[in-house]
Amino acid sequence: MKKTTVTKKIINFREKKIAHDLDRKINSVVKDIIKGKPVIVVDSIDRENEGDLVISAEKANIDNVTFCMRYARGLMCVPCNHKILSRLKIPMMVKKTNDKYETPFTVSVDSIKTHTGMSVYDRLKTISTLLDEKSKPSDLQKPGHLFPLK
């Protein structure tokens, strides 16, 4: 067998192993998110080169939201699809962003059933308001402390 053929087989094996390991790690992270555990998602060094603490909005609870507030200490964002944003009449923060990453921020919101919007309980109430299909635009106040992302 030629040296180049052996080298190609070794490289192919390594690539398959890397892909398998990556699939295994991604599956493990997805399982943790489904269980409501916080995970850190790191973006590319070519982008913001940062990590985001991610939890499932459907599994948000006192423990994992407290964890996020205590250790992440940044903006709390909630990804929302077009249907949610339309139903709740949540507008984009700006029509055309000049943010080089084009992060699709909307106007921040709080549930009207919150006190200041800052506490863990207030943030949980706002998250549940966003997720509740029966919620109406009048159930939210703007601006608030949670940032829906389109």
Across the structure, where does each feature detected by a protein language model lie?
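Catalytic domains of riboflavin
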Residues: 2-150
